[in-house]
Curated annotation (Swiss-Prot):
Feature: transit peptide: 1-18
Cytoplasm among keywords: no
Purpose: Mitochondrial membrane ATP synthase (F(1)F(0) ATP synthase or Complex V) produces ATP from ADP in the presence of a proton gradient across the membrane which is generated by electron transport complexes of the respiratory chain. F-type ATPases consist of two structural domains, F(1) - containing the extramembraneous catalytic core, and F(0) - containing the membrane proton channel, linked together by a central stalk and a peripheral stalk. During catalysis, ATP turnover in the catalytic domain of F(1) is coupled via a rotary mechanism of the central stalk subunits to proton translocation.
GO molecular function: proton-transporting ATP synthase activity, rotational mechanism
A Pfam short name: ATP-synt_DE_N
Species whose genome carries this gene: Caenorhabditis elegans
The protein, known as: ATP synthase subunit delta, mitochondrial
Quaternary structure, from the entry: Subunit of the F-type ATPase which has 2 components, CF(1) - the catalytic core - and CF(0) - the membrane proton channel.
GO biological process: proton motive force-driven ATP synthesis
Top-level taxon: Eukaryota
Subcellular localization: Mitochondrion; Mitochondrion inner membrane
């Protein structure tokens, strides 16, 4: 009886694994950037020279052949240098960075704003309001106010080219 039970359960379904799909235009000698937010695709698999990204671990400069990396974005300016040498500066509030072995890089941000579109006076007003709120209310409200203040400070730095 035990032999039949063991035999019945010894037929285990073998797990199949899919073969890795080849990446489209994979060339680790190129840096392919996808930079997007939920409502905006700034770059879509575009070949660029360099991307500088603010992360919780510090600024990360990404070039072709970069070691695979993941990171969490902090509020600040992402600088994208195209192959032609032009630099595009965009403010991000938060998000993720992923650098892959195939030469691709994804910057997925919660919010993206062109640096030249930042309203410095509105950012200063938000900073003042957040600082006032940081000493009031529940622990959650104080934490939210601290996050608002951090984003407002980063916006002001970006608007005044302090980054």
């Amino acid at each position: 009886m035990l032999a039949r039970t063991i035999q019945r359960f010894s037929v285990v379904a073998k797990r199949g694994y899919a073969a890795a799909a080849p990446a489209a235009n994979a060339n680790p000698e190129e840096l392919r950037l996808t930079f997007a937010s939920p409502d905006t695709a700034v770059f879509s698999n575009a070949v660029v020279k360099q991307v500088d990204v603010p992360t919780l671990a510090g600024m990360v400069g990404v070039l072709a052949n970069h070691v695979p990396t993941i990171g969490v974005l902090k509020p600040g300016v992402v600088s994208v240098t195209t192959n032609e040498g032009t630099v595009q500066r965009l403010f991000v509030s938060s998000g993720t960075l992923s650098v892959n072995i195939d030469g691709s890089c994804q910057v997925l941000a919660e919010e993206v704003l062109k640096v030249e579109e930042i309203d410095e006076s509105a950012a200063r007003a938000e900073l003042d309001a957040a600082q006032r709120a940081s000493g009031e209310g529940s622990e959650v409200a104080r934490a939210e106010a601290q996050i608002r203040a951090e984003v407002a400070e980063a916006l002001i730095k970006a608007a005044t080219n302090q980054q």
